[in-house]
């Protein structure tokens, strides 16, 4: 029979994964829009609960708050998990705990238990995880988003490109373990952006700052 010291790393990782998922499941965009008296954000624009769709309410402050809070879900989950695990399971397990908790926060954001597993696309939460677990990679990804967004004016394209490059950045700036986790998160983001990809290919995706044409 395995002793407690043998089981402890697995137990710690399990708790970190669950806590990360539950934190990620908190739908800050939905909560903020409702508190502002603007109804259900899922009935606006794309129906997404993230910052981009919150911006369609016309409230930049709510969109910014959503962006910060959604990013914070990944960052806080990763940092807290890593700090706690480092005291129990050792440094290597602490790194894995941070990656796992941050990754599960992204899963929670995309498939929140509180909303019937229908959530967002996880870009902000993923970037928060990158910044918390390997900040040089996170900064490189954020810089990539800014460059692509400035050049092409597509938020979705900027997100897809920056997350696709994150694993490559991690191989240079972090570790293969970081690269593997970031690759999985990038794949999840691409899957969640299927409709955006289709619109990009058709030239129908909305550009950043574009005004909708008034109905005749």
Swiss-Prot record:
The keyword Signal does not apply. One of its GO terms (molecular function) is acyl-phosphate glycerol-3-phosphate acyltransferase activity. It is found in: Cell inner membrane. GO terms for biological process: phospholipid biosynthetic process. GO terms for cellular component: plasma membrane. It is a multi-pass membrane protein. Pathway: Lipid metabolism; phospholipid metabolism. It comes from the Bacteria. The chain crosses the membrane at residues 11-31, 62-82, 95-115, 132-152, 171-191. The keyword Transferase applies. It catalyses: an acyl phosphate + sn-glycerol 3-phosphate = a 1-acyl-sn-glycero-3-phosphate + phosphate. Keywords: Cell inner membrane, Cell membrane, Lipid biosynthesis, Lipid metabolism, Membrane, Phospholipid biosynthesis, Phospholipid metabolism, Transferase, Transmembrane, Transmembrane helix. Its main location: membrane. Its EC number is 2.3.1.275. This is Glycerol-3-phosphate acyltransferase. The lineage of its organism: Bacteria, Pseudomonadati, Pseudomonadota, Alphaproteobacteria, Rhodospirillales. The gene is plsY.
């Amino acid at each position: 029979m395995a002793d407690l010291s043998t089981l402890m790393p697995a137990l710690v990782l399990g708790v970190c994964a669950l806590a990360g998922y539950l934190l990620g499941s908190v739908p800050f965009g939905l909560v903020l829009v409702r508190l502002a008296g603007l109804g259900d954000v899922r009935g606006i624009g794309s129906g997404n609960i993230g910052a981009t769709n919150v911006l369609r309410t016309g409230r930049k402050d709510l969109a910014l708050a959503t962006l910060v809070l959604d990013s914070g879900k990944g960052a806080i989950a990763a940092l807290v998990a890593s700090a706690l695990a480092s005291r129990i399971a050792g440094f290597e397990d602490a790194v894995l705990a941070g990656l796992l908790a941050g990754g599960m926060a992204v899963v929670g954001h995309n498939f929140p238990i509180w909303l019937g597993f229908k959530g967002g696309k996880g870009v902000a939460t993923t970037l928060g995880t990158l910044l918390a677990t390997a900040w040089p990679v996170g900064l490189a990804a954020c810089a990539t988003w800014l460059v692509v967004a400035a050049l092409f004016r597509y938020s979705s394209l900027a997100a897809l490109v920056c997350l696709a490059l994150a694993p490559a950045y991690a191989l240079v700036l972090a570790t293969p373990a970081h690269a593997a986790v970031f690759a999985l998160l990038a794949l999840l983001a691409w899957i969640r952006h299927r409709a955006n990809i289709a619109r990009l290919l058709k030239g129908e995706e909305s550009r950043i700052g574009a005004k909708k044409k008034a109905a005749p």
